[in-house]
UniProtKB/Swiss-Prot annotation:
Keyword Electron transport: yes
Provenance organism: Microcebus ravelobensis
Protein name according to UniProt: Cytochrome b
Biological process terms in GO annotation: mitochondrial electron transport, ubiquinol to cytochrome c
Gene: MT-CYB
Subunit structure: The cytochrome bc1 complex contains 11 subunits: 3 respiratory subunits (MT-CYB, CYC1 and UQCRFS1), 2 core proteins (UQCRC1 and UQCRC2) and 6 low-molecular weight proteins (UQCRH/QCR6, UQCRB/QCR7, UQCRQ/QCR8, UQCR10/QCR9, UQCR11/QCR10 and a cleavage product of UQCRFS1). This cytochrome bc1 complex then forms a dimer.
């Protein structure tokens, strides 16, 4: 008799995706982040659902409803902090996942890579709208500053901003629609994740060597289910330590003050995972130029497969490219640091240099280094 998991219409989809899936035998722990991102998404949806049961999307009660969740709801504080810090873990895994894709040449799986970029944009939009919901000082001013960037779009900019706000400033209408979108987007993300996996399973996973895995594959279960569980344990341990010992470590103290449209915080800055893009935005004196640079800082990922001129897919045996990759990583750390600093000398100059280096590395230096490596290997 054939096993039910191979014949049942629903179970056979699960089986071919997570049990009998042929996987390369040599993929390292860097391939764990896909499953960890799935776990993060599940944590965010579950905790978010419980928070939505007690939250009110109204400017007069939003802040106090979050306080009520933390003080009066059973285990409300832990749900709130799991959700807030879960977002940080989500982005940490996302950045490592994208970095692994760049290092090992996974961007040659074009459909998977491009849907991944769409997912990154969607997750960033969701996180931004979620940050507005507690209606603290940084929530309000962050929403005002970031949505106002759209006014840089020629001709339609001002109308577009007022349309998004639902009025002439960030107010009740803005908060209500942000809550609606913040609630629905994770489910859209879940659907996109399925499409991401669909395209990945069409081609099969890449591996650290960047070579074809067709000759040597093993079933996903039990080998990689166990490996993913180990990664999940580390993720949950880190998240638990963060939530129980230092829940506000990655947050902004200004967000414990209710939103006040008449008082601007001394330094408006987003959460840590947006700081690199915020630094790039601030490094360009022109408003429209800054907005374009901000969008391009993420959209540039879509250009990477076009700039791929190396004969070797992975960077594993390309030491010069490895050096450039780690310089890019250090540059992103620098941009993240600069994004959290005040707009004054020398931070502005450092930010401008780091921004130029970021785009130069991806668009010019790394392809040039790949060309040199090809010549060195006489290819």
């Amino acid at each position: 008799m054939t096993n039910i998991r191979k014949t049942h219409p629903l179970l056979k989809i699960m089986n071919s995706s997570f049990i009998d899936l042929p996987a390369p035998s040599n993929i390292s722990s860097w391939w764990n982040f896909g499953s960890l991102l799935g776990a993060c998404l599940a944590i965010q949806i579950i905790t978010g659902l419980f928070l939505a049961m007690h939250y009110t999307a109204d400017t007069t009660t939003a802040f106090s409803s979050v306080t009520h969740i933390c003080r009066d709801v059973n285990q409300g504080w832990i749900i709130r902090y799991l959700h807030a810090n879960g977002a940080s873990m989500f982005f940490l895994c996302l950045f490592l996942h994208v970095g692994r894709g760049m290092y090992y040449g996974s961007f040659t799986l074009y459909e998977t890579w491009n849907i991944g970029i769409i997912l990154l944009f969607t997750v960033m939009a969701t996180a931004f709208m979620g940050y507005v919901l507690p209606w603290g000082q940084m929530s309000f001013w962050g929403a005002t500053v970031i949505t106002n960037l759209l006014s840089a779009i020629p001709y339609i900019g001002t109308d577009l901003v007022e349309w998004i706000w639902g009025g002439f400033s960030v107010d009740k209408a803005t908060l209500t629609r942000f809550f609606a979108f913040h609630f629905i987007l994770p489910f859209i993300i879940s659907a996109l994740v399925m499409v991401h996996l669909l395209f990945l399973h069409e081609t099969g996973s890449n591996n650290p060597l960047g070579t074809s895995s067709e000759s040597d594959k093993i079933p996903f279960h039990p080998y990689y289910t166990i490996k993913d569980l180990l990664g999940l344990m580390f993720l949950l341990l880190t998240l638990t330590i963060l939530v129980l010992f230092s829940p506000d470590l990655l947050g902004d103290p200004d967000n414990y003050m209710p939103a006040n449209p008449l008082s601007t915080p001394p330094h408006i800055k987003p959460e840590w995972y947006f700081l690199f893009a915020y630094a790039i935005l601030r490094s360009i004196p022109n408003k429209l130029g800054g907005v374009l640079a901000l969008v391009m800082s993420i959209l540039i990922l879509a250009i990477i497969p076009i700039l791929q001129i190396t004969k070797q897919r992975s960077m594993m045996f390309r030491p010069l490219s490895q050096i450039m990759f780690w310089i890019l990583t250090a540059d992103l750390f620098t941009l993240t640091w600069i994004g959290g600093q005040p707009v004054e000398y020398p931070f502005v100059t450092i930010g401008q240099v780091a921004s130029i280096l970021y785009f130069s590395l991806i668009l010019v230096i790394m392809p040039a280094v790949s060309l040199i490596e090809n010549k060195m290997l006489k290819w």
